[in-house]
Curated annotation (Swiss-Prot):
Mg(2+) binds at residue 26. One of its GO terms (molecular function) is GTPase activity. Pfam families: GTP_EFTU (PF00009), GTP_EFTU_D2 (PF03144), GTP_EFTU_D3 (PF03143). It is found in: Cytoplasm. GTP binds at residues 19-26, 81-85, 136-139. This is Elongation factor Tu. Residues 136-139 are annotated as: G4.
Amino acid sequence: MAKEKFVRTKPHVNVGTIGHIDHGKSTLTAAITKYLSLKGLAQYVPYDQIDKAPEEKARGITINITHVEYETEKRHYAHIDCPGHADYIKNMITGAAQMDGAILVVAATDGPMPQTREHVLLARQVEVPYMIVFINKTDMVDDPELIELVEMEVRDLLSQYEYPGDEVPVIKGSALKALEAPDDPNHEAYKPIQELLDAMDNYIPDPQRDVDKPFLMPIEDVFSITGRGTVVTGRIERGRIRPGDEVEIIGLSYEIRKTVVTSVEMFRKELDEGIAGDNVGCLLRGIDKDEVERGQVLAAPGSIKPHKRFKAEVYVLKKEEGGRHTPFTKGYKPQFYIRTADVTGEIVGLPEGVEMVMPGDHVEMEIELIYPVAIEKGQRFAIREGGRTVGAGVVTEVIE
């Protein structure tokens, strides 16, 4: 009889290359795929294919982003790379492609540069939990002491932004040399690539899956079913829900209502359990149709609270991206789209010395909504005005 096919189910991890322009991010990405293709663990994606990244849209913003995938003996990786500096900022803020760990690429010839710092700051703000350093172009530096110096500078930079600078793995090599090396995986030039992959396998832990987090479902729609009660529908963002589970309805006021989900349905069939990613309807015990609305969330008790004021990193769209043509100042009142909630808010605080925000800027700001919404650190949102997206942001701190 035919043998069963052996399917490997390796843990999945999302990573990305970050760092200053021309330090070799795309070259390194290409080199990883080339090396692993020689071991049968990836498809080789050449540099020019990575560099001409396709456009995708996230929260109304166009971003150029390349996705490659590859495997090591231990894991399956999805790896993102962006060609332009602005694309990185937009990606990190919109969370178009989130990272469980980042590979910070620093050229030995330059050391840390302004964008190196900006990417590390953003990675910290959006909570990229782990950082690995690849010091690139080491073949172009004759003095080993200079490379040591660059390593010290990078470790110091990471420590400034609360990464464990002393513990972060630092790999030194040349991505270009690996890319140009012969097709023998044991060739000397691939050593740093293997070291980098080992560091990724061992230093970045398996991420917690969405399904294992506390339950949360943004409410998209509300129905009343005669004789049965009120049903709310939406896509489960995280966790799992079973009939009989207690939940809270949160948002649009400071009052939190407790209820029990008596039935979970998908395509009109009852489910034993709904999990992250499922589009479901939840029947709620003792809740009238007018007591719950779109923009609220259904969540595990105590897992999230309603808030009005928060700090956020925001990217403001350029005119060419369909954004505003003019700057705005403190007191600007656009609409904030947070999950399914659409709520007016005011920019109540800008950094010291910043009087106005120009289209194309990336800035930290304090925002106050007219009513509370379920918000937490790391929450992504869109800013809209007159029916068009003018910005995107990520919550960095909840104030009240």
